Amino acid sequence: MSSPTPDALLGPADVRELAAALGVRPTKQRGQNFVIDANTVRRIVRTAEVRPDDVVVEVGPGLGSLTLALLEAADRVTAVEIDDVLAGALPATVAARMPARADRFALVHSDAMHVRELPGPAPTALVANLPYNVAVPVLLHMLDTFPGIERTLVMVQAEVADRLAAGPGSKVYGVPSVKANWYAEVKRAGSIGRNVFWPAPNVDSGLVSLVRRSEPLRTTASKAEVFAVVDAAFAQRRKTLRAALAGWAGSAAAAEAALVGAGVSPQARGEALTVEEFARIAEHKV
């Protein structure tokens, strides 16, 4: 791997100059906050444990701050960008600041939620500063669509990071926690201050690490069947599962039968259950 140019990464002045040249103003609609600190993006790459043979997919690369740091460490990087102006500019930024690695970069101009395939080798890692307003749907979509993604590190709103990494019994344990755990072991991997972004957001950010399960969850129920139970259980999270799952099962009595068959108390609440227990409930639906 060739050595990167010492000043290849973007600093605060670089980000603002690029944005000004492109006429870009970060929009809340797309949850855009650009990282302006080179040390932060290198820390993200280190925490993600990006390897020289990794094929990394990045969602929402923006002006390219994290993209360039990923290109220093990975074999290939594919970035998915929805914004017309940003997607048009990023290949030129990569070519100008890291010419020796430009042939290792690919840009997909698309909404990440619509991406079903990527150019080149299948991705082995997902590393991204996810737009805050779509972070969870995009994360779950990418994990589902690209089973070769073994390791993921995403930067999201701190509150979302807490939810994703929460375990049963936590007040913030919910649908994102369970669905992420269907695919991977999930944990918090650090915090990011507001001052490394432009513009500075009104909320703190957190890093979340996801390591894909070495074997899929053992269940005869499909993912859709399990997720239907999860959605029903948390739609009325204060209710007992017997009541919350009545609509899903067809009646409270049918819900109770499925719960008892799964070895789960009908008086329990969704926030107390593991993804394995939700799967067992799905298996016992009559």
UniProtKB/Swiss-Prot annotation:
Disulfide-bonded cysteines: none
Listed EC numbers: 2.1.1.182
Principal cellular location given in the protein's record: cytoplasm
Cytoplasm listed as a keyword: yes
Gene Ontology molecular function: 16S rRNA (adenine(1518)-N(6)/adenine(1519)-N(6))-dimethyltransferase activity; RNA binding; rRNA (adenine-N6,N6-)-dimethyltransferase activity
Keywords for the protein's UniProt record, in alphabetical order: Cytoplasm, Methyltransferase, RNA-binding, rRNA processing, S-adenosyl-L-methionine, Transferase
Any one of the GO BP annotations: rRNA methylation
GO cellular component term, pick one: cytosol
Database matches in InterPro entries: KsgA/Erm (IPR001737), rRNA_Ade_diMease-like_C (IPR023165), rRNA_Ade_Mease_Trfase_CS (IPR020596), rRNA_Ade_methylase_Trfase_N (IPR020598), rRNA_adenine_dimethylase (IPR011530), SAM-dependent_MTases_sf (IPR029063)
Catalytic activity: adenosine(1518)/adenosine(1519) in 16S rRNA + 4 S-adenosyl-L-methionine = N(6)-dimethyladenosine(1518)/N(6)-dimethyladenosine(1519) in 16S rRNA + 4 S-adenosyl-L-homocysteine + 4 H(+)
Annotated positions binding S-adenosyl-L-methionine: N33, V35, G60, E81, D111, N129
SMART domains per the UniProt record, alphabetical: rADc
Alphabetized HAMAP family for the sequence: 16SrRNA_methyltr_A (MF_00607)
Alphabetical list of NCBIfam families matching this protein: ksgA
Biological role: Specifically dimethylates two adjacent adenosines (A1518 and A1519) in the loop of a conserved hairpin near the 3'-end of 16S rRNA in the 30S particle. May play a critical role in biogenesis of 30S subunits.
Protein name, per record: Ribosomal RNA small subunit methyltransferase A
